UniProtKB/Swiss-Prot annotation:
GO terms for biological process: diaminopimelate biosynthetic process; lysine biosynthetic process via diaminopimelate. Binds 2 Zn(2+) or Co(2+) ions per subunit. Transmembrane segments: none annotated. This is Probable succinyl-diaminopimelate desuccinylase. Keywords: Amino-acid biosynthesis, Cobalt, Diaminopimelate biosynthesis, Hydrolase, Lysine biosynthesis, Metal-binding, Zinc. It comes from Staphylococcus epidermidis (strain ATCC 35984 / DSM 28319 / BCRC 17069 / CCUG 31568 / BM 3577 / RP62A). The keyword Amino-acid biosynthesis applies. SUPFAM superfamilies: Bacterial exopeptidase dimerisation domain (SSF55031), Zn-dependent exopeptidases (SSF53187). Zn(2+) 2 binds at D105, E140, H377. It is an enzyme of class 3 (hydrolase). The active site is at D74, E139. Pathway: Amino-acid biosynthesis; L-lysine biosynthesis via DAP pathway; LL-2,6-diaminopimelate from (S)-tetrahydrodipicolinate (succinylase route): step 3/3.
Amino acid sequence: MTVLSEQDKIRLLADIVKIQTENDHEIEVCEYLKDLLSQYDIDSKIVKVNDSRANLVAEIGSGAPVLAISGHMDVVDAGDHDDWTFPPFELTDKDGKLFGRGTTDMKGGLMAMVIAMIELKQSNALKQGTIRLLATTGEETEQYGAQLLADEGYLDDVSGLIIGEPTSNIAYYAHKGSMSCVVTAKGKAAHSSMPHLGTNAVDILVDFVNEMKQEYKNIKEHDKVHELDAVPMIEKHLHRKIGEEESHIYSGFVMLNSVFNGGKQVNSVPHKATAKYNVRTVPEYDSTFVKDLFEKVIRHVGEDYLTVDIPSSHDPVASDRDNPLIQNITRIAPNYVHEDIVVSALIGTTDASSFLGTNENNVDFAVFGPGESIMAHRVDEFIRKDMYLSYIDVYKDVFKAYLEK
C-alpha cells in the first residue's frame, strides 16, 4: 500500500535538505521527523547530545525480533555555495536527479527509511517484530550520536541492523574500522649554530616513521587471508578485475602517515614534531594490535621522547556474508533496481562501529542505501530520483521479510 505520493516523497526529502546540518543542528531534523511521524501515530523520542545536536528514536510494531534501521542527519560542509550549479540547501529536481547537500549522504537514505516505516504502519503490514529507527547526529565526525544510543541500550535487543548509507546497489555485510593516531616527539630547542646543545625532535620522529614503515611492510607480507572481502566492491567501482596483490591492499590492513609537522623556524633546533596516521583496521589486525604496535615502536625508537595519542578509534564490523538481511536484499532489491546486487565488504566505516563494536553478538548486519557513493561530499551532490523512490519499496519489503523470517 502506498500512502504518500511521489510528489510527497520528494517534498519530504526537500524539507530536510533545507535544514542546514553541516556538522551541527541535527535537532532541527529530529523535531521535523518527530512531527512527521506523529501525523501517522508513530511515537518517537529525541535523545539529546547537547542543545543543538541530538538523535531520534522511533518504533513501529512490537516484540521480537527487533530490526534497527539507521541513517545520520549531519552533512559535510557545502563549501563555497557559488561553486554549486544549484543552491546546496534547496532541493532541485532536474533531469531525473535530485540535487542538494545530503541528498546522497545521506538524507535520501534516511528519508526513504522513514517513509517505508510510515507506509508499513499505515497499511498494517507488519505482523511480527519491531522496526526501530535510529537517526543519528555526528556520524561525519566522531560518531558520538551512535555511541550515545549504544551506551543507553538502544542496540541491546536488536537482531538485525541496516545502515542506509549510499552503496551504489552494493550490499555490504561488513566494513573496516578506522583509527587516528598522533605521534608526538619532544626534544630540546637550541640555536642552529650549536645543535649539539639541543635534541632534534624531527630526527627522532623521522626514525619513528621509518621504523613504522618497515613494520607495515612486514605486516603486508603476511596479510594475505582476509575475513573481509572488499574485492567485489572495488571491481564494480573500477569496472575491471583486480589481481591478487591488489586485492590484499583493498581487503587488508592499511596504514598511512598522512601528516608530518616539525620545527617553526630555520635557525632553531626543533623541539617538537608530530606525525598523524590514519589506520584502516580489519579483524585480523584490530585496534588492540595497532595500539600495541605503536607502543612497541615507541619503546624501540625512544620512549623518553615519543608519545602516541589516539583521538578516534572505530572498530571493524563483520557479520556472516549470507546473513538473513543480505539474503533478503539480494532477493528483493533486483525487482526494483533492475540489476543484481553485488555483496561485498566496505573499505570505509559507518555508525555500526559504535552501535555494534566488533559484533560479538553476531547481529545480522547490512549497509544498503540509495545513492552513488562517489557523489558523497561533492559539489553538486545528487541522488537519482528513481533510485530514491525505488529504495522506499525495497526497504518496505526487506524490513517485512526479515521480521517474518
